[in-house]
Curated annotation (Swiss-Prot):
Transmembrane segments: none annotated. The active site is at residues 22, 40. The gene is acyP. The keyword Cell wall biogenesis/degradation does not apply. Residues 76-88 have a biased composition (Low complexity). It catalyses: an acyl phosphate + H2O = a carboxylate + phosphate + H(+). NCBIfam families: PRK14425.1 (NF010999). GO terms for molecular function: acylphosphatase activity. Residues 76-95 are annotated as: Disordered. Its EC number is 3.6.1.7. Keywords: Hydrolase, Plasmid. Residues 7-94 form the Acylphosphatase-like domain. PROSITE patterns: ACYLPHOSPHATASE_1, ACYLPHOSPHATASE_2, ACYLPHOSPHATASE_3. It comes from Rhizobium meliloti (strain 1021). This is Acylphosphatase.
Length: 95
């Protein structure tokens, strides 16, 4: 991972399913030029792997707290990850 590129594995909890959170995440990530994926989890949370320029990753982590209209985010937990794990582009996956 280069100095200006980073990746984060993120778990978002709250009312984040049934509110187009994955579509919103993909749109925001593409707008910010991030690579990675997002998926719903069976416990009602959403998990995402985001990778790209440090500033863009930081902005996306901030955006997760707001989410799309209808979402009510309770927590955004992130940990550093390897950017090599992120596919090129951004996609919605299934858990």
């Amino acid at each position: 991972m280069t100095k200006d590129r980073r990746a984060a594995l993120v778990r978002i909890t709250g009312r984040v399913q049934g509110v187009c959170f994955r579509d919103w995440t993909r749109e925001e990530a593409e707008r910010l030029g991030l690579d990675g994926w997002v998926r719903n989890e069976s416990d009602g949370s959403v998990t995402a792997l985001i990778a790209g320029p440090d500033g863009a990753v930081s902005r996306m982590l901030d955006h997760f707290w707001k989410g799309p209209p209808g979402a009510s985010v309770a927590d955004v937990a992130s940990e550093e990850a390897s950017s090599a794990e992120a596919p090129a582009g951004f996609r919605i996956t299934r858990g």
